[in-house]
């Protein structure tokens, strides 16, 4: 008998577009762990918790418009930030990661007035998919004191750690599920003349036209 021909694996990834503005869409990476009701394909939005202070939450309808802010060199070396304009007149609200009290690995995402955390970015080549980094992002069911203890879905981020025996720990708290935040192209908001925000360094970002239309099981390896 002749040799068995090895099956050639042809990489297949979803087509991306380019836009300065984008929404962030929640992709629940393990559907069996999803909340009830599901938050898959929900949009990232802000949760007001004080003057110019916001947690990052989710909503069923298109949420905040984001853009990557930085020079070409800053984008290349992961020193850019992700910003969403807010308030009147518009000011930049930067996406930041604030370490949780008592934790070395879990941070809470914030969208406060200011520049945001450098290194929060949309993935680039050679990574074949587009998603927000650094991973792993989480969606967590948390009570917020600002709302008298009411529960909200809050976005957090956890660092992956490796144990002495080589085991990998994704450090996902019990009240959280792992998610990816996927950029969906949208038109960047225009700014009025009195805006404190600026789009001078709003970068072209690779994003998907319609995240909810993507069947992720069709892509790979």
Swiss-Prot record:
One of its GO terms (biological process) is aerial mycelium formation. It comes from Stachybotrys chartarum (Toxic black mold). Glycans are attached at residues 27, 69, 141, 215. It holds the Pfam family DUF7907. It comes from the Eukaryota. This is Antigenic protein SchS34. Keywords: Allergen, Cytoplasm, Glycoprotein, Secreted. The lineage of its organism: Eukaryota, Fungi, Dikarya, Ascomycota, Pezizomycotina. Expressed in the mycelium (at protein level). It is found in: Secreted; Spore; Spore wall; Cytoplasm. One of its GO terms (cellular component) is spore wall. The keyword Mitochondrion does not apply. InterPro entries: DUF7907.
């Amino acid at each position: 008998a002749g040799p068995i021909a090895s099956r050639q694996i042809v990489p297949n990834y979803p087509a991306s577009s380019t836009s300065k503005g984008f929404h962030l869409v929640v992709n629940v990476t393990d559907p069996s762990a999803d909340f009830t009701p599901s938050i898959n394909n929900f949009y990232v939005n802000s949760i007001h918790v004080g003057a110019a202070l916001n947690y990052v939450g989710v909503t069923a309808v298109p949420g905040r418009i984001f853009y990557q802010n930085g020079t070409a060199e800053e984008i290349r070396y992961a020193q850019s930030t992700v910003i969403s304009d807010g308030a009147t007149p518009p000011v930049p609200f930067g996406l930041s990661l604030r370490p949780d009290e008592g934790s070395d690995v879990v941070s809470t995402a914030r969208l406060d007035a200011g520049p945001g955390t450098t290194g929060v970015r949309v993935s680039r080549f050679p990574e074949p998919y587009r998603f927000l980094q650094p991973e792993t992002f989480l969606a967590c069911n948390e009570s917020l004191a600002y709302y008298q203890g009411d529960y909200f879905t809050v976005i957090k981020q956890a660092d992956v750690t490796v144990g002495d025996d080589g085991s990998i720990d994704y450090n996902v708290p019990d009240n959280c599920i792992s998610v990816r935040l996927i950029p969906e192209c949208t038109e960047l908001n225009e700014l009025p003349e009195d805006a404190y925000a600026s789009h001078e360094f709003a970068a072209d970002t690779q994003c998907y036209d319609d995240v909810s239309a993507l069947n992720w099981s069709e892509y790979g390896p």
